[in-house]
């Protein structure tokens, strides 16, 4: 069977993702884009089997233009390593594409996006999903879970469970890694093990990556972003 058609499809998806990436940088459908340095789009194989969706970029992500590179991202990378996964085989993104924060002195402190802000970003996320076509998704935290499932999600009672989105895709709900950073230090080890147990439920979907060779036929989505900070409004 010829590989030309799948290769063309991958190239088209990569081009479309790149265009979406550029478009999110210009997005002003909510006020967050006015204050952020830049948008932070997803990155990973164009047709990754498993997509991981977080809440929003943090301070470091906002400056570097890449998802999950701050403290929560390092914790996520540690979990990926312990599970025997490779981040290069995951498509990682956020439900909200711009950093929401409040200034405290010279520090920019994370603020949870309002539902209207997440809703304004939903079409970007839906477009990513349509192009990447993951078999399964992991929702890290309540904002991501609500965006994917279209309803409020009680993360603590629904974590470690598979749910179906409107298109019938499987969505695993668990905590955002930042919740582990804020948690009770005495419970940190137990919380870590419980989080790993949640994530491990997605291992069958991850392991199926090896049989989906077409993901390696195109370069990963994502781009090198500028590092200059936009002055806060």
State the predicted function of each range.
Residues 2-233:
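A polyanion-binding, active-site-adjacent surface
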